[in-house]
Swiss-Prot record:
Heme b b566 binds at residues 97, 196. Belongs to the cytochrome b family. A ubiquinone binds at residue 201. This is Cytochrome b. The cytochrome bc1 complex contains 11 subunits: 3 respiratory subunits (MT-CYB, CYC1 and UQCRFS1), 2 core proteins (UQCRC1 and UQCRC2) and 6 low-molecular weight proteins (UQCRH/QCR6, UQCRB/QCR7, UQCRQ/QCR8, UQCR10/QCR9, UQCR11/QCR10 and a cleavage product of UQCRFS1). This cytochrome bc1 complex then forms a dimer. Its cofactor is heme b. PROSITE patterns: CYTB_CTER, CYTB_NTER. The lineage of its organism: Eukaryota, Metazoa, Chordata, Craniata, Vertebrata. GO terms for biological process: mitochondrial electron transport, ubiquinol to cytochrome c. The gene is MT-CYB.
Length: 379
């Protein structure tokens, strides 16, 4: 009798994706982040569902409903902080996942890579709308500032902003629709993640060497299931340490002040995971230019496959490209720091230099260095 795991239409899909999947024998811990992102997504959907049971998306009661969750709901505080800090863990895993893709040339699977970029945009939109929901000062002013950026679009900008707001300012209608979108988007993300996996399994996984591994495959289970469980354990331990010891470490104290349209906070800034893009936005004095730079800071990933000039796929054996990659990482950390600083000297200049360097590395230096490496190897 054949195994039901391999014959039943439903279990066959699971079997071919997570059990009998042929995987390269040499993929490192950097390949753990896909499964960790899946765990983050499930965790966010579950905690979010329980929060939505007690949350009210009305400007008069939103702030107090979050307070009510933390004070009166059974284990409400842990659900709320797991959701808030879970978003931070989600973005840490996302950035490391994208970084891995850049380092090892995973972008040479264009379909998987492009779906990944769409996923990144969708997750960023979801996180932004979620940040608005507690209706604190930073929620309100963050929503006002970021949605206002769309007014930079020529001709239709102002109408577009008012259409998104549902009025002439961020108000009740805005909060209600942001809650609706914040609820539905994670399910769209789940569908996109399934498509992401579908495209990945068409080609098979890349590996650190960047060399095809068809001649040397091992089954996903037990080798990589146990490896993923170890990664998941690290993720949960880190998250729970954050939640139980310093839940407000990554948040903004201003968000504990109820939203007040008549009082602007001294420094409006988004959550830490958007600071690099926010710094790029602020480094351009022109509004439309800043918005374009903001979008391009993520969209630039889409043309990375076209700029791949090296004859090797991975950076594993390319020390010059490795130096550039780590310079890019340092540059992104610098941008993150600048995004949280006030708009004054010397932070403005540092931000502008870091922004220029970011695009220069990705669009100019990487392709040039790759050609230089080809010549050094006499290829």
């Amino acid at each position: 009798m054949t195994n039901i795991r391999k014959t039943h239409p439903l279990t066959k899909i699971i079997n071919n994706s997570f059990i009998d999947l042929p995987a390269p024998s040499n993929i490192s811990a950097w390949w753990n982040f896909g499964s960790l992102l899946g765990i983050c997504l499930i965790l966010q959907i579950l905690t979010g569902l329980f929060l939505a049971m007690h949350y009210t998306s009305d400007t008069t009661t939103a702030f107090s409903s979050v307070t009510h969750i933390c004070r009166d709901v059974n284990y409400g505080w842990i659900i709320r902080y797991m959701h808030a800090n879970g978003a931070s863990m989600f973005f840490i895993c996302l950035f490391l996942h994208v970084g891995r893709g850049l380092y090892y040339g995973s972008y040479m699977f264009p379909e998987t890579w492009n779906i990944g970029i769409i996923l990144l945009f969708t997750v960023m939109a979801t996180a932004f709308m979620g940040y608005v929901l507690p209706w604190g000062q930073m929620s309100f002013w963050g929503a006002t500032v970021i949605t206002n950026l769309l007014s930079a679009i020529p001709y239709i900008g102002t109408d577009l902003v008012e259409w998104i707001w549902g009025g002439f300012s961020v108000d009740k209608a805005t909060l209600t629709r942001f809650f609706a979108f914040h609820f539905i988007l994670p399910f769209i993300i789940s569908a996109l993640a399934a498509i992401h996996l579908l495209f990945l399994h068409e080609t098979g996984s890349n590996n650190p060497s960047g060399i095809p591994s068809n001649s040397d495959k091992i089954p996903f289970h037990p080798y990589y299931t146990i490896k993923d469980i170890l990664g998941a354990l690290f993720l949960i331990i880190t998250l729970m340490t954050l939640v139980l010891f310093s839940p407000d470490l990554l948040g903004d104290p201003d968000n504990y002040i109820p939203a007040n349209p008549l009082n602007t906070p001294p420094h409006i800034k988004p959550e830490w995971y958007f600071l690099f893009a926010y710094a790029i936005l602020r480094s351009i004095p022109n509004k439309l230019g800043g918005v374009l730079a903001l979008v391009l800071s993520i969209l630039v990933l889409a043309i990375i496959p076209l700029l791949h000039t090296s004859k090797q796929r991975s950076m594993m054996f390319r020390p010059l490209s490795q130096c550039l990659f780590w310079l890019l990482v340092a540059d992104l950390l610098t941008l993150t720091w600048i995004g949280g600083q006030p708009v004054e000297y010397p932070f403005i200049t540092i931000g502008q230099l870091a922004s220029i360097l970011y695009f220069t590395i990705l669009l100019v230096l990487m392709p040039i260095i790759s050609i230089a490496e080809n010549n050094l190897l006499k290829w």
